[in-house]
Amino acid sequence: MQVLWKKFQKKLIDANLAECGIEIGVPNVGYNYTVFQKSVLHIVTQGEGTFSYAGETYHLTAGDIFLLERGMEVEYKPSFSNPWTYYWVGMNGKQILNYLSRCSIVDSHVILGQDTTDIKNIIQLICKLSQSIESNNSNDILIMQYLYQLVYTLQEKFPKIFSVQVDIVNEDIQHAVDFINTNYQKHITVEDVAKSVNITRSHLYKLFKKNLGCSPKEYLTYIRMYHASQLLIHTSTLISDISRQVGYKDPLLFSKNFTKHFEISASEYRHHFSINNKQ
């Protein structure tokens, strides 16, 4: 029984909340279909159920997560004796799906037996907010900031480890990634990354696009923004100091890039997500 199912208009290329909802399961009444949505994340909040995909069946309980992606043939249903309740959030957009692809759940499609309290809280908040936002305002920044926070929380807790095959090309990309991960705090550029592995910028670009699906600049920005977001959440360090700690000489440029990246300013991000504000 669907307690909530709200759909939203697609307005942005980078990120959209496509839908969200709440379902209280009816014993042994479930769904069996081919997924047509881009990406839909579900979290079980109570009860039990099963999720079947690619010949495997998983028993899910409170806190477990499953992800549906376009083209998957799936079946999921509540148990008879203890039917589940779950919340879901559907998303689309080039940037948000690219960020989601860096989470291990895009490979496993299920997360079992882990602490997902933060993820549950964000999804429940999105569903709650959706009830007071009209569909023609579906991309309001209030919703968008939590959508980005959801994906980044997933990535923080369940990151995908970039696997690199042992050959000349992938050794270059691994060294480049290691260089960025180690030196993002410094004022490094893509040119510095290319020099560190002794290849041209154009060749470095091709390697990143082929192996990671993003450009070197996008990866460097992602790493800097991720670490900046963690400093905003977990410390009271001045934003100007954070900008320098993640490799920016100019705090104004950092603020501009942060706002572009998250669609919310650094100060607003801290206001909403800082652990100090939750105590």
UniProtKB/Swiss-Prot annotation:
Domain HTH araC/xylS-type: 174-272
Keyword Transcription: yes
GO molecular function: DNA-binding transcription factor activity; sequence-specific DNA binding
Matching Pfam families: AraC_binding, HTH_18
Alphabetical UniProt keywords: Activator, DNA-binding, Transcription, Transcription regulation
SUPFAM superfamilies membership: Homeodomain-like (SSF46689), Regulatory protein AraC (SSF51215)
DNA-binding region(s) from the entry: 191-212, 239-262
Record function comment: Transcriptional regulator of the lacPH genes for lactose utilization.
Name under which the protein is recorded: Lactose operon transcription activator
Species for this entry: Staphylococcus xylosus
Record gene name: lacR
